[in-house]
């Protein structure tokens, strides 16, 4: 599916060849991303790791009660845990083709909604007030959540302190961040595409 986008600050248009978005692929890629981010530090102690006496708690016979050895057995409150969580990595690998496909589908989803904007130049010199003026002039001020994708350090410095923007480099662009932001504003240089 070809998507033609106007470039803000220029008369040119850019045509991107993007696939039709599929929820299953997007879900797969987001699940992969989030699993890599998991801390994986949940930990429990087994009966061998719980601190306590190793002595038999009462004689085997003659008490009329059930047979028990260790107070650290899982059956007791304060005892060890059986098959509890241990620190581990939840990361797994996803084919590169699927990752690329997911990224392109996320961009296509935003483009279909008219929420993907390419910009020729931000005309910002590192000051937040300049970026706010630029955003106001181009109708971006007041949007709920904006993902700003640019490699220009001055633009990143100007926009990073605003509560409604998330700023990232082109190399860090990912499916999860695209989908959790209402609007994506990107430097036209990051996307090649065909110019018209």
PLM features: residue spans?
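Extended polybasic, low-complexity segments that bind anionic RNA or targeting/receptor surfaces
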Residues: 1-39, 84-196
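Short coil/turn segments at secondary-structure boundaries
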Residues: 41-47
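Glycine/serine-rich anion-binding loops at beta->alpha junctions
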Residues: 47-83
């Amino acid at each position: 599916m070809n998507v033609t986008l106007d470039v803000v600050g220029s008369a040119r248009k850019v045509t991107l060849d993007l696939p039709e978005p599929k929820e299953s692929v997007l879900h797969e890629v987001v699940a992969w991303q989030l699993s890599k981010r998991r801390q994986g530090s949940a930990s429990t102690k087994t009966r061998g790791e719980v601190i306590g006496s190793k002595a038999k708690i009462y004689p085997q016979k003659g008490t009329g009660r059930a047979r028990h050895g260790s107070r650290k057995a899982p059956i007791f409150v304060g005892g060890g845990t059986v098959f509890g969580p241990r620190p581990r990595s939840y990361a797994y690998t996803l084919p590169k083709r699927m990752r690329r496909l997911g990224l392109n589908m996320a961009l296509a989803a935003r483009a279909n909604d008219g929420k993907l904007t390419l910009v020729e130049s931000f005309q910002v010199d590192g000051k937040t007030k300049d970026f706010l003026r630029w955003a106001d002039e181009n109708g971006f001020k007041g949007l709920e959540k904006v993902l700003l994708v640019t490699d220009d350090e001055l633009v990143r410095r100007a926009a990073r302190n605003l509560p409604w923007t998330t700023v990232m480099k082109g190399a860090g662009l990912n499916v999860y961040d695209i989908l959790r932001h209402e609007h994506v504003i990107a430097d036209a240089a990051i996307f090649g595409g065909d110019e018209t």
